[in-house]
Amino acid sequence: MLSMPSFERKQNIFANKDALGESYQPNKIEERDDEIEKYMDALQPVIDGWEPNNIFVYGNTGVGKTAVTDHLLDQLQTDVEAYDDVTLSVIYLNCKTLSSSYQVAVELVNKLRRPGAEISSTGYPQQSVFKKLYQELEALGGTILIVLDEVDAIGDRDDLLYELPRARSQGNLEDAKVGIIGISNDYKFQEQLDPRVQDTLCERELQFPPYDALELANILDSRTDIAIADDSLAEGVTQHCAALAARDSGSARQALDLLRLAGELAENQDADAISTDHVEAARSELERERVEEGMRELTTHGRLTLLAVVSKAAKADTPSRTRAIYDEYASLCKSAANTDDPLKQRSVHNHLSDLHMLGILSKYENRSGSRGNYYSYELDVPFESAVDAMADVLMLDAEIEKMEGLASRNGVL
């Protein structure tokens, strides 16, 4: 009978792996001096005792929006303690799973109420929920900053974003001074807002651009001093992680995830140090995970649509127009077992758009004058990652094998 394996600590690569994690808050935010200065200027009315600005912060995922917000609000809450005439409360709400002003208002009410006194998520008129929210805010009093992270999730159902900043002027609040900080990954969200909401919510706008490779390398260097053990990092590793992340999204989170996973791979192999080979292996694994995560959301026809783009890529024929991808898709439908007739081209176009939103495809708009505009698509993940993620899902082994052979001959692999 085999004995049960035991757990043993591995500490040859990492000194403090948590320093590479998403929840880690560094003492100093790197490479965001200009944004911090503008943000502090927008928050200055709080320390001065005036009504707070409403602030709209936007930029891609992983560019420091939430980290800078958390850092500055923590500092602000500490600094206001030096003044007797200012009290500050910060309410943080992630709106990712909320799709309307009503749902946001309910969540805010329940955050402000004591346990056991929460209200139901359904069954109230919207204005009734807003009234309850005003009552809770007024009871709290002082200056209140409401941080709505991923605020774009509520879409165009944005009544609260109009009502709340105006609550004091409309007589719904007397003692409480409320400011909203909206954080969004969607640059176009502001354009979708009601013009009245734009006027109130976007008093101060702060844009966080993607990091470049040098900035990402500096961020990684500051973390590796804490996270990685001495002599456990080969030369050029942080620069390689930074270059890959800068080329893709400019995301510090992506660069940190690459380094963390590369370290885990090195540790599992009992390597003395993290190498660029470990980084490349980590990149491939993260890409595969991204595709697989997106794949879980796809129907069979969504997967066949993706495989059609893979087929075009194998022929070195991408970016490809929707029509050409549709023809490839229809051919694959005939080969696939237990598959209904091909969908209409419009439905395949919708699947292509979904794949673009999931980060699996790149989408290009082509303007061709009198012939009208059209879209073309290509893979936004490595060919191997897309194939590997589908190999065990679609029963098209022979077709996939042909694609891999063709890709190899065309230099795609």
Swiss-Prot record:
It comes from the Archaea. Keywords: ATP-binding, DNA replication, Nucleotide-binding. GO terms for molecular function: ATP binding; ATP hydrolysis activity. ATP binds at V63, G64, K65, T66, A67, Y211, R223. Disruption phenotype: Essential for normal growth. SMART domains: AAA, Cdc6_C. GO terms for biological process: DNA replication. PANTHER family: CELL DIVISION CONTROL PROTEIN 6-RELATED, ORC1-TYPE DNA REPLICATION PROTEIN. Involved in regulation of DNA replication. Belongs to the CDC6/cdc18 family. This is ORC1-type DNA replication protein 10. The gene is orc10.
